[in-house]
Amino acid sequence: RGVTDEFIEPVVLRGRPRLEPEDAAIFFNFRPDRARQLTKLLLDDGYDVTTMTRYSDELDTPVAFAEQDVDETLAEVLSEHGLRQLHAAETEKYAHVTYFFNGGREEEWPGETRLLVPSPREVGTYDKQPEMSAEEVAARFDAELAVGGYAFAVVNFANPDMVGHSGVIPAVVKAVEVTDACLGRVVETVERLGGVALITADHGNAEQMLEEDGESPHTAHTTNRVPLVVTDPAVSVEDGELGDLAPTVLAYLGLRKPLQMTGRNLCK
């Protein structure tokens, strides 16, 4: 029918199309951001639920694989030094710059400010609105930077990934164009305030829109190498990995990295 994975609608199987009182559920999601709501719903209805990982301390479920505590994250180290920090994104990527960025911590660290911009809800898929909320994210982020006195700020633009999942190439092109313009605006603000911007990603998507056959849409993340652009003309940037970003930020701030960080400063 020409329906790819991204757009398969829910299916009800014949025979037993619903959960019965004696049924139990096993949740295979390892990420909690989309699983905890459904888990809570099942628990509230009295079902036995086992989850792959711990989704929330508020959910009393057996867990297949216990999580490891992540200590001395970048946000925690900045907080320990009394530095202010800003974390900003629209809804689709808000958890990525807060909960995930902070090693699975829900609460803000002292000195941490969070900025949430609602993602569009007027469309079913973002190829219909590839600009998403990027312009508002950039505007509010810039305004907060200008008055906040932050030592560190992180902002996520969701467009290349979220629109990339649609596989609709013209929409992805528009998404990247909008992101480029908004990113340029943010960099101008950072440089005007005397700061340095580090521009990177944690995975690819929009750069590969077709499968190897040259026809089928590619809608998944890629494992391609990602760029790291540093807007400091006085340094050269070495190849590295995502784990090197936090030590690089700390080096710019003149802070020693904790022993828990095994990465290195990429700017020489």
Predicted segment positions?
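Feature captures the catalytic ectodomains and active-site-proximal regions of enzymes
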Residues: 1-268
